[in-house]
Amino acid sequence: MSHLSTINACKLLLFRRCLQAVLLTVGIQFLLLTIFLLFVNFQLLRPLHWISVTLSLVCSMYTWFASIPLVGAVVLYGMILCQQHLAERLYCPTRFRWLVHYAPRKLLFLAAHLLVGYLTAWLYTGYMHTDYRHLWYKCYDQECISAYHVYLLGMGIFAGCYYFVSVHMRQEVEIEFPIVNHLWGEKLREVLYSSLARSLIKSLLPTLAYTLLFWLFGGVVCHKLSHIFAVDLDERLEGFFGVATNGRLLFYGWLLTSQILSNMHLMRCFYSMFLSEEFPLAITKNRAAFVQEKEVTVVAALGLSNVYVVQCLAAKYLYNLVTAGDAEKRSELFQLTEPGNRPANWRSLCDQCLSLFGNFTDELIDSMQKISVLKGSPSSPPLTPISENASASLMAERVLTRQYNQMHGIRAIVSPRSNAVIDRPVDRIHRVPDWCERTSMQLEQSLQLLINRIPGIVYMFTEPEGAKTAFLLTHSLPLVFVIQALSQICVFSLKEDRYGVVQTDLPDIIRSMSRLKGELDKLSSVASNLRGPGSSFSVLRGAVRRSLFHICVAFGEYLSELIPSGEELHQLQTVINQE
């Protein structure tokens, strides 16, 4: 299978999982609506009537038709979330490049958040009391703008904006791989309980913040709406006490905010649940497969660096395969394949893993050169300039040699014309005057300082220190799984590798891990100052140290044969002693 067909096959499978997440999210909308109606229509003395009325409202035709706009917004939200999961993770060195690449996508995602928040508030207000249900109501035999309805609609928009700013504005969507695999029903129940309970607490701050904003600017908004629709102004929420003392309105706003936040959090969790499921990969390429069958191997999936999700799933699959304790499945890695009885499976896997190690380490070294604390390029010794006395003595020696040759009739090897060219004084070479060079350098430095003093230029068009290093560490999850899987393969090869296909590559594997460990040790002094990758750095460094330790312990008797005596062998022995 070609590289392009591998990408298409993986994206098609992930797109199907995203559709399943969207369908589950649509079903959850009715569960959230049921919970909201149970709170709004609460009747302690008539519990059966309370539950029956709530269920009849959820199952009514009005609910099914009124929820169509919200379902459409949820589907749009899910498609944008799917696109962000499958998009390539590009590094933007400057903030201007980040705006050019990510701003259109972020603006579209913000619009989806606002739309879901507004339509959720619009749908839920239809089940409240008459004062909250419509945009205007009868007051003193006239039509008036309902400030309660405006407050709740604005609360929905503000809740969607709040979730986008706090979760998605500066961060990319990530998949959380569970440490312990549970049944699908257990995971769904855990996500529902935790999301609903957490949203009740997290919705307090945005509710209070929006209430303060509505007290400051709500009157202006209601006045504009009354002027647009040619109706009277509602005066029930004028002043601070008019807003702060309305307990029912504040309760509805808090409950609505918690529903919107939990809804968006559940959509994010559902995508993580479906996309983190085990990917159907193969170790050995089935040569007898039909042409229509698109079988993706682990090696091919690990090579898809432009689809980060697939690379993570392939690395996780390899890690689970090695650590599951099934020796029969691991034997596919060591077996010899036809034709030629060559270790094709191990050869391709080892080359791909070493390529991942090498590329990541090289990029990490290049990015660390831009950190001022770690900057240390090897300096070459300066060239010794020729002094004027040495130049004069050389010219005098040439003149004496020419006179001696003419006196004794010795011809020159080269023609006199060539001698004239060679003996031309160095001072006659045309050079740019020193004052011109100094002037041009001063002008260049002055212009650069002038540009840097313009507000926003340095902020927008300069690469922050350590940004590339932070980007690499944040996206190092595939490397964490691959390093641990490869070390376990090397350890198991002592008993399961009957042909010795792994031992020939052990020196290269140890050197690659040791090289990466050395660079991470250098970075440990400044990792806390980098923005974002603190936990990622700790996880990666711990995985490298642990993997190298397992290999060194398993092959401790043979280290001197695998690695020649020297600094590398001393470092490996130090790793064993430290652990």
From Swiss-Prot:
Residues 1-21, 82-106, 166-202, 258-579 are cytoplasmic. It is a multi-pass membrane protein. GO terms for cellular component: nuclear membrane; nuclear pore transmembrane ring. GO terms for molecular function: protein-macromolecule adaptor activity. It is found in: Nucleus, Nuclear pore complex; Nucleus membrane. GO terms for biological process: mRNA transport; nuclear pore organization; protein transport. The chain crosses the membrane at residues 22-42, 61-81, 107-127, 145-165, 203-223, 237-257. Its main location: nucleus. Residues 43-60, 128-144, 224-236 are perinuclear space. It holds the Pfam family Ndc1_Nup. InterPro entries: Nucleoporin_prot_Ndc1/Nup. Keywords: Membrane, mRNA transport, Nuclear pore complex, Nucleus, Protein transport, Translocation, Transmembrane, Transmembrane helix, Transport. Component of the nuclear pore complex (NPC), which plays a key role in de novo assembly and insertion of NPC in the nuclear envelope. Belongs to the NDC1 family. This is Nucleoporin Ndc1. It comes from Drosophila pseudoobscura pseudoobscura (Fruit fly). The gene is Ndc1.
